[in-house]
């Protein structure tokens, strides 16, 4: 089934992929991504592990109603979270060689 040394090479490749995956996970956890709403009037910066680092609110919004501001903050956070997911997919594809995963399955398993 496997040629001479084939299984050893396969195991070596799997270990290398696992090492790259671990480094990539650390890189993703430490990256920062900024999401925006209200044409940039509200910005939320989060890490790759979805911890909020910073919330920036344009002063012009301080006079508007509280409910609208809350909606803009939520929208900015959701935008940042979406950007983290997109970045994770792109970076993981570079490690997995574009290997497609079943729907709903995320790496790491």
UniProtKB/Swiss-Prot annotation:
Chief site of localization: cytoplasm
Keywords, in A-Z order: Cytoplasm, DNA-binding
Domain of life, source organism: Bacteria
Segments of this protein annotated with the region Disordered: 1-21, 88-109
Molecular function as annotated in GO: DNA binding
Cited Pfam families: YbaB_DNA_bd
Location in the cell: Cytoplasm, Nucleoid
The keyword Cytoplasm is assigned to this record: yes
Entry keyword annotation includes S-adenosyl-L-methionine: no
Cellular compartments per GO CC: bacterial nucleoid; cytosol
Subunit structure: Homodimer.
Family of the protein in this entry: Belongs to the YbaB/EbfC family.
Its biological purpose: Binds to DNA and alters its conformation. May be involved in regulation of gene expression, nucleoid organization and DNA protection.
Alphabetized NCBIfam families for the sequence: DNA_YbaB_EbfC
Protein name: Nucleoid-associated protein VIBHAR_03086
Source organism of this protein record: Vibrio campbellii (strain ATCC BAA-1116)
Lineage of source species: Bacteria, Pseudomonadati, Pseudomonadota, Gammaproteobacteria, Vibrionales
């Amino acid at each position: 089934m496997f040629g001479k040394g084939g299984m050893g090479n396969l195991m070596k490749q799997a270990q290398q992929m696992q090492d790259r995956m671990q480094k990539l996970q650390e890189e993703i956890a430490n990256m920062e991504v900024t999401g925006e709403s209200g044409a940039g009037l509200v910005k939320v910066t989060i890490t790759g592990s979805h911890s909020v680092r910073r919330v920036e609110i344009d002063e012009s919004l301080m006079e508007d109603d509280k409910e609208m501001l809350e909606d803009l903050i939520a929208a900015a956070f959701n935008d940042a979270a979406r950007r983290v997911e997109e970045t994770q997919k792109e970076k993981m594809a570079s490690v997995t060689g574009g290997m497609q995963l079943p729907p709903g399955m995320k790496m790491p398993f």
